[in-house]
Amino acid sequence: MILYFTGTGNSRYTAQELNRFCGDELVSMNREMRKRRQDPYNARYAYTSERPFVIVCPTYCWNLPKVVEEFLLNSRFLDSRDMYFVLTCGSGTGQAGKRAAQVCETLGLNFRGLASVRMPENYISLFRAPEPDEAVAIIRSSMPLVESIAMQISSGRDISDSFAGREVPSFVVRLFYRLFVHDRRFYVKDNCIGCAACASLCPTVNIRMRGGKPEWQGHCTQCQSCIGVCPVDAIEFGGRTRKKRRYYLFADGRQKFPNEKRETEEDEEKR
């Protein structure tokens, strides 16, 4: 079973490519997270698979996203006792492998390794997204590695991370979360069309529409989905994102361009 968490589509696309080679069940953690917040009594908390569990997600501050860690620690994994991690990143994964091993130990699972896949930069609250042609080149250059990872998992071998880089001190991670992982600086401009694409995709159900405009509720994970999916680029994060190109990767591998109508995740999966 491949469970993926995605903000702007990089990890979803990677999970889909892994699935193309592995032929396994594909589960959206985004959808599962929304269900847990909206209807906790009827949400799914147990996952059963005879094949290894494969967790695909972005790298947040050289570590596992806290929202993914919390999801895993509040889930039950049945039958298979093996878990792999595949993280998308712009550079290195730091101590993500160490933390993933700790999560597996807590869950009573066998940590079978972590591998990273370089994908286009999407964290425009700090950096700049690549131009479309450059993004395509980055994605294409990473797909042979994704196939190799899939083959290793299918054959039952451990995987390893060739892009881990140095471990980042824990105080740096804490400082990063305190300074950047919040929604206090998000705002919407006058060109917002009230389509609610941002609210429908938010994995933490952190956006509510009021008067046809999005309002953030204080439990943002900075996945960048809202700022990336907006069809008219109406969402900003303070002054850091002004005039920056947005990045969003559709399920079929296309990039979003300004003024392109945005489908919901459910719409995409029906195609």
What is the meaning of each model-derived region?
Residues 2, 6-13, 17-33, 43-57, ...:
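FMN-binding flavodoxin-like domain, especially the glycine-rich phosphate-binding loop
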